[in-house]
């Protein structure tokens, strides 16, 4: 998942949940209220973290947890053909995914659990990359490597599909959520076996350049074929399973369908997610609309992308992703409201997903704990208050992340060192069931 770096803290906070007024009451209509839970931070490494995660989701009226269970060719679940993640805490028999499923499915109301898996990114230290990287590893046209596996290598797709089907067979997950389902960029795809296969299928002898249109189309088709074939196998294995994916939305979005082929998703990382949604390869897609609302250009980017997502014929297969880690809390809430509102022609999406549980705002992110200079781009500079040690900053970030769970479902306020008390209004004041995207 692509993250942009932001920074900033508050000197003090006030956790002041207030009473929601009747006018703020939600309709209770089905709506995805999802939360990404990444494995690079705490969230499900220990039994205590899992218990807190479910309690926080209930407090926030979150009804879907998208939990990262395959980070770098590893597993946050015990019954796996890949190695158990090294940072799982507790006894060896503790199974993070199994315990989360038990608590989330037993919650009232029930919380869905979608297993988030990195597809082509494995990391250069993962077992699969160490063992197979020489032949399966993706390479740039200059020979560089970055820990990605190459979609153009048939064995990569076979192995990865096997990992995912094994997960679905062993755990009662509600959905499978694909991330890094793409190339790293336009100059990638040059593993020897992928280039050899392209030459054979295209009937050419020369190695293509990165901008060769046929070579670009071939790489794009490799990614699409993996998604299509995986869906086919998953629906045989478990028809009720929901397949989704984290989708690229770099820069400004298209104004309509005619502009789709000019996007970075389509022509740079070869992720033709518009066709996946139109053809129903995904039950729903989650475009990563990660933009800072306090930057005018990025705010415009966000609004253009969500307009495209609502009015291009596949709104019934879209859950809009918002980047809390790039925003002040009140701005994230504003983005959620805009995402959930009807378009100018009356179209609505299935819901929203928030990135992320560990970084709910620029005050809750750890991207910049050791780098106060990274806060220089923020319009409000809350990097005062005397806390300079890592543990103190982490504790303050944790307090903000906890507060945000309250802000989602209750009126609340917090204290900013420059603006004083800032009041927020909830976006999920009542629980809501998940919709059926099919």
Q: Can you describe what each PLM-predicted range is?
A:
Residues 15-23:
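C-terminal segment of classical bacterial N-terminal signal peptides
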Residues 62-94:
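Aromatic-lined carbohydrate-binding/catalytic grooves of carbohydrate-active enzymes
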Residues 28-33, 41-45, 110-170, 209:
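Active-site-adjacent "subsite" loops/lids of carbohydrate-active enzymes
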Residues 56, 138-281, 288-291:
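Polysaccharide-binding and catalytic clefts of secreted carbohydrate-active enzymes
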């Amino acid at each position: 998942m692509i993250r942009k770096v932001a920074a900033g803290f508050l000197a003090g906070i006030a956790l002041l949940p207030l009473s929601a007024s009747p006018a703020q009451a939600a309709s209770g209509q089905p709506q995805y209220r999802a939360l990404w839970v990444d494995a690079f931070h705490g969230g499900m490494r220990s039994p205590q973290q899992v218990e807190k995660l479910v309690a926080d989701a209930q407090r926030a009226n979150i009804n879907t947890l998208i939990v990262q269970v395959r980070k770098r060719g590893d597993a946050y679940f015990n019954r796996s053909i890949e190695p158990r993640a090294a940072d799982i805490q507790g006894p060896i028999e503790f199974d993070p995914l199994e315990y989360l499923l038990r608590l989330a499915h037993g919650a009232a109301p029930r919380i869905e659990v979608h297993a988030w898996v990195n597809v082509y990114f494995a990391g250069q230290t993962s077992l699969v990359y160490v063992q197979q990287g020489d032949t399966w590893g993706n390479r740039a046209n200059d020979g560089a490597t970055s820990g990605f596996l190459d979609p153009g290598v048939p064995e990569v797709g076979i192995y990865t599909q096997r990992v995912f089907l094994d997960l679905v067979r062993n755990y009662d997950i509600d959905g499978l959520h694909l991330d890094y389902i793409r190339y790293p960029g336009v100059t990638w795809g040059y593993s020897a076996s992928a280039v050899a296969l392209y030459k054979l299928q295209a009937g050419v002898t020369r190695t293509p350049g990165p901008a060769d249109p046929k070579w670009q189309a071939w790489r794009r088709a490799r990614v699409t074929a993996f998604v299509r074939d995986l869906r086919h196998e998953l629906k045989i294995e478990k028809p009720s399973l929901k397949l989704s994916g984290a989708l690229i939305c770099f820069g400004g979005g298209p104004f309509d369908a005619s502009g789709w082929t000019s996007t970075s998703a389509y022509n740079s990382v070869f992720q033709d997610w518009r066709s996946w949604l139109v053809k129903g390869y995904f039950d729903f897609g989650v475009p990563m609309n990660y933009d800072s609302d306090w930057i005018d250009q990025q705010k415009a980017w966000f609004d253009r992308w969500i307009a495209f997502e609502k009015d291009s014929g596949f709104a019934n297969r879209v859950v809009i992703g918002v980047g809390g880690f790039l925003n002040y809390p009140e701005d994230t809430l504003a983005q959620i409201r805009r995402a959930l509102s009807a378009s100018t022609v009356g179209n609505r999406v299935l819901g929203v997903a928030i990135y992320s549980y560990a970084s709910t705002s620029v005050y809750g992110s750890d991207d910049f704990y050791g780098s106060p200079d990274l806060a220089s781009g923020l319009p409000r500079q809350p990097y005062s208050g005397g806390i300079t040690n890592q543990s103190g900053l982490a504790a303050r970030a944790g307090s903000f992340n906890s507060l945000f769970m309250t802000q989602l479902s209750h009126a609340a306020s917090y204290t900013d060192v420059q603006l004083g008390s800032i009041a927020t209004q909830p976006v999920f004041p009542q629980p809501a069931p998940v919709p059926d995207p099919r």
